């Protein structure tokens, strides 16, 4: 799709190519947790385990990057990328590790999600 297409058109179509195996116009939802490998670290489809990435999330990331990656005049912005995660804790971990350095202080509420609290308390 072109960055000149409207927001709604890009939201519906960007990142979505017909499935090469079935011809399905809408990309299928991939529920698989693991993907075949030709050898250790040799990933013919580019995916290994759904926790680190899968085709469904890749389509979502492409579409979101397209929607967020244009300026007010519809021109593409360079280096714009979207990231989708397998869980909320994975997203929290990525954001916190990208923003904080060892020794930084972070204030979180005492009723924060337990996994996030343990991440902050024991890892960061």
Task: Give the predicted meaning of each segment.
Residues 21-24, 75-77, 98-99:
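Solvent-exposed alpha-helices and their adjacent loops that cap or buttress functional pockets
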Residues 98-116:
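Conserved PLP-anchoring active-site segment centered on the Schiff-base-forming lysine
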Residues 1-47, 54:
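N-terminal glycine-rich, Lys/His-bearing helix-loop that initiates the first secondary-structure elements
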Residues 15, 23, 88, 103, ...:
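Glycine-centered flexibility sites
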Residues 34-94, 115-122:
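Conserved N-terminal alpha-helix of the aminotransferase class I/II PLP-enzyme fold
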Residues 99, 123-124:
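Active-site catalytic pocket residues across diverse enzymes, especially alpha/beta-hydrolases
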Residues 18, 83, 109-110:
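Short, flexible coil/turn micro-motifs enriched in small/turn-prone residues
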Residues 28-29, 81-83, 104-105:
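Structural motif
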């Amino acid at each position: 799709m072109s960055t000149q297409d409207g927001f709604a058109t890009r939201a519906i179509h960007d990142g979505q190519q017909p499935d090469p195996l079935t011809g399905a116009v809408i990309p299928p939802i991939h529920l698989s947790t693991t993907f075949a490998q030709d050898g250790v670290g040799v990933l013919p489809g580019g995916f290994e385990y759904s926790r680190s990435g899968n085709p469904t999330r890749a389509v979502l990331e492409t579409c979101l990057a397209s929607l967020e990656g244009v300026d007010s005049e519809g021109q593409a912005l360079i280096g714009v990328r979207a990231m989708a995660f397998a869980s909320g804790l994975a997203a929290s971990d990525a954001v916190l590790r990208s923003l904080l350095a060892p020794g930084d202080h972070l204030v979180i509420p005492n009723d924060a999600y337990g996994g996030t609290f343990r991440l902050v308390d024991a890892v960061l």
